[in-house]
Amino acid sequence: MESAEIRRRWLSFFEERGHTAVPSASLIADDPTLLLVPAGMVPFKPYFLGEVKPPAPRVTSVQKCVRTPDIEEVGKTTRHGTFFQMCGNFSFGDYFKEGAIQLAWEALTNSVEDGGYGLDPEKLWITVYLDDDEAEQIWRDKIGVPAERIQRLGKKDNFWSMGVPGPCGPCSEINYDRGPEFGVEGGPAVNDERYVEIWNLVFMQYERGAGDGKEDFPILGDLPSKNIDTGLGLERLAMILQGVQNMYETDTLRVVMDKATELTGVRYGAENSTDVSLRVVADHIRTSVMLIGDGVTPGNEGRGYVLRRIMRRAIRNMRLLGATGTVVKDLIDVVIDTMGQQYPELITDRKRIETVALAEEAAFLKALKGGTNILETAVTETKAAGGQVLAGDKAFLLHDTWGFPIDLTLEMAAEQGLSVDEDGFRRLMQEQRDKAKADARAKKTGHADLSAYREVADTAGATEFTGYASLAGESTIVGLLVDGVPSPAATEGDEVEVVLDRTPFYAEGGGQLADTGRIRLDTGAVIEVRDVQKPVPGVHVHKGVVQVGEVTVGAPVFASIDATRRRAIARAHSATHLTHQALRDALGPTAAQAGSENSPGRFRFDFGSPAAVPGTVLTDVEQRINEVLSRELDVQAEVMSIDEAKKQGAIAEFGEKYGERVRVVTIGDFSKELCGGTHVGNTAQLGLVKLLGESSIGSGVRRIEALVGVDAYNFLAKEHTVVAQLQELVKGRPEELPEKIAGMLGKLKDAEKEIEKFRAEKVLAAAAGLVESAKDVRGTALVTGQVPDGTSADDLRKLVLDVRGRIQGGRPAVVALFTTANGRPLTVIATNEAARERGLKAGDLVRTAAKTLGGGGGGKPDVAQGGGTNPAAIGDAVAAVERLVTETA
């Protein structure tokens, strides 16, 4: 049974049993704690946690997953892979243990004719959690599994949790006995190579507390509702159903290995080392295609680094196998042709995937050539000196100059019997990051060379900041730069950077935006200040434009800030402190500040959190903040020693470095933080705070965006107007709106389903007419045509196969149908066995048609799919297919 059929059969089986089929989510995880989706349940986490209402009580999916922790083991074992498809069925408070177990048993053991996978029940072994008497009783008494094929295991093997406090529960695994050639008897507790796990049923019924590892945590109690989360590895089931030794020999990976052997001349099975490389190539190329297809591009951080690492390992292993030229395009085309049957978007997005992959291949081949020479020289020098450790600076050079990921250097060094000074490498990497941050901060002033600012600091001393007490004041120009170059004077229209001996202007820092305003000279000259930065400690650089007159160093000036803007920013900054404290009160000290920006009338606050903050918690936080405003608490600032500040429990601000004396901002009895920013005098001055929402900005970091003061009021006023309009439209009170709108959307969805059903029936009804239209081309029945626009790929495929099946007499048959979906042409072509014996293969025909359509395609000899960009060329594509059939038949 092909992988595509396993996938189709899974979804069909559970849909027939009341489950709503949900498409695979993107591999890019919508979860700050994850770079990529590693399990089928990840897209459903909000439902299990009660944060979002599930789309249905029963759901099924086949989820794309990527896991890379064991990447070094890929190819060396027959079970490790970076990409896999997780088939899952989920229940949110609906059926529980007995229902999940019954469904799993039926799916695996029902005959193929009855929609199951037809596994031999005698080869299935069950594991249950040590104390789960209920699950064992169901397996034994309800299903009929003999007691000797049911084994109890501990928390490590048969108890599931997310690794943090939250839902958890015992699980039951279904294992398949592959026979004595894979090891000794004794069940999965003894030999997991012979008794391979294929399906895990998780019974989420408890809430766990904090703890370490898979076993050391307490059970706090029962969950309000009991849920089911199951996962079956599609590749593992394919291995069994296709009767192969390991997952690399299944249909979707073997074709990639076959292409790699074709490109290198190496035979699979000849020797272990080349087999490992072939398996690495097959796995990594497939993973690369799936990642690029979901929008990941190679890079040096996060998901991009995962992709780059995987692609470069694949390319290098092709080199180890003897490949000399570019190989990536040939390999990814095989993956797209194969996986495109299950994920048609890969076929339509082929060009972009190829472009991204080929660019990375070109970059790495260039890097590999130069970097390998450097590495070989370094290895030779190290060995000649009697060393066994490659220096960290060599690894850094390879990374910085040639783009070698550290794990590639580790791997290549190990092949030469050397280890690598990883600590030294990481130290140099950190030094580079620190330098980059310093340069970025300097460039923010418009001039990366800090010498001019240091010279001003050396001659004139630090700028005295007077902005805490006053919004304007007299000063003197002690430094002047025009277009980044020191100058004694500047004239009207010049872009300038001005340094004063004292200033009321706040320089950007601590998350607070800089003040803006004007600097006036006695001569009438005016500088409009647009930004203020501190490129070196103690020096305020005022960036702006000379609007009128001439400005000279040494001239007396009067500096004044935009007071309205300053007050709006101060409100935002004080609101940020209140939000920080309210979040810590709600979530605990882990909700530490990770960044902020305070601008006029609005602010954003970044904080640590392993998961999204529930909407109810955000509502409570907002209410708490506004309660504090109504208490009219005084806001006070005091300078004290850092030790005294710590004793008082003051919270340090993210990203700031502090000296021995620090400024502490205290808001009544509610908040106390180290802060150099400007604030209101009393919380009543904030007026109102409105949290707009919360989102992820990275792994383990969330962001709240909010409005304060008049901006918050204006937002609520607009919302009130919208609510009033909705009331008028649906004829209901505000509290009735969600239910009424949900009902309307439900009716709309039902109507769309009916339309879709009618359209599908109409398409299939055309089958008889299409059969009658068949042409005889040199003894081959050829059916071509264009079906109504908007026909889905699945419906088009069903129609093509239906028409092919109706052609009688055992004569050769080719069916090629076309449609337009979302403005793009789509074709599915099928051939029967008699046609294939004449050399008429669906994949060849599709490639011919798709080329005419301005795209690409592929598939199996019996059925293939393609698409393009030019729907006007469908007639030409039909003609091209007819010509090829005529020439071949």
Swiss-Prot record:
**Has the keyword Ligase been applied to this entry?**
yes
- Compartments in which it is found: Cytoplasm
Which InterPro entries did the record assign?
aa-tRNA-synth_II/BPL/LPL (IPR045864), Ala-tRNA-lgiase_IIc (IPR002318), Ala-tRNA-ligase_IIc_anticod-bd (IPR018162), Ala-tRNA-synth_IIc_core (IPR018165), Ala-tRNA-synth_IIc_N (IPR018164), Ala-tRNA_ligase (IPR050058), Ala_tRNA_ligase_euk/bac (IPR023033), DHHA1_dom (IPR003156)
Its required cofactor(s), as named, are: Zn(2+)
The catalytic activity, as recorded, is: tRNA(Ala) + L-alanine + ATP = L-alanyl-tRNA(Ala) + AMP + diphosphate
- Specify whether Glycoprotein is a keyword of the entry: no
Enumerate the UniProt keywords alphabetically.
Answer: Aminoacyl-tRNA synthetase, ATP-binding, Cytoplasm, Ligase, Metal-binding, Nucleotide-binding, Protein biosynthesis, RNA-binding, tRNA-binding, Zinc
The signal peptide, as residue positions, is: none
This protein's source sits in the domain of life called Bacteria
Which GO terms fall under biological process for this protein? Answer: alanyl-tRNA aminoacylation
Q: What class of enzyme is it?
A: ligase
Tell me the CDD domains matching this sequence.
AlaRS_core
Q: What does this protein do?
A: Catalyzes the attachment of alanine to tRNA(Ala) in a two-step reaction: alanine is first activated by ATP to form Ala-AMP and then transferred to the acceptor end of tRNA(Ala). Also edits incorrectly charged Ser-tRNA(Ala) and Gly-tRNA(Ala) via its editing domain.
Q: Which family does it belong to?
A: Belongs to the class-II aminoacyl-tRNA synthetase family.
Task: State the protein's name.
Answer: Alanine--tRNA ligase
Species of provenance: Streptomyces griseus subsp. griseus (strain JCM 4626 / CBS 651.72 / NBRC 13350 / KCC S-0626 / ISP 5235)
